[in-house]
């Protein structure tokens, strides 16, 4: 059973430089948004195989797009965020869009992403595990250990956090 359709307006989001996109199966949103900003964009998608190559590079920005809610436990989330921080340049930025998911809740939603040039990308996201949580407060608290929080937004069931590496 499909839940709500949520809307994210990304017309005013500008991510510049080399981007490390950790969006997993939601790939394409960050790429489509970024290629409107710059002619040539280097976006790397992380998989287990590419982790070793990452250690050789430093990125200007890192993005998570609705994938932290699939990670079990706060310590695991923190470990991933800490690792990603090591791939960012000094003062690199992290951008996180995710769903506010309390314990016991399941998610089956569609997200319409409004991109530059009036493009629209639809993404479905599901999380049927009632034990996993992913809340704005939980993620913000982890980020504050490694980043200066520059911007936050919470609307409907979604949150956005932008931080700059400290």
Q: What are the roles of these predicted feature ranges?
A:
Residues 14-28:
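Conserved class I S-adenosyl-L-methionine
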Residues 1-17:
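Conserved alpha-helix/loop element of class I SAM-dependent methyltransferases that forms part
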Residues 2-5, 41-53:
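A short, well-structured beta->alpha microelement
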Residues 70-90, 98:
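A short, conserved alpha-helix within the catalytic core of class I
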Residues 51-64:
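A short acidic, Gly/Pro-enriched loop at the edge of an enzyme's catalytic core
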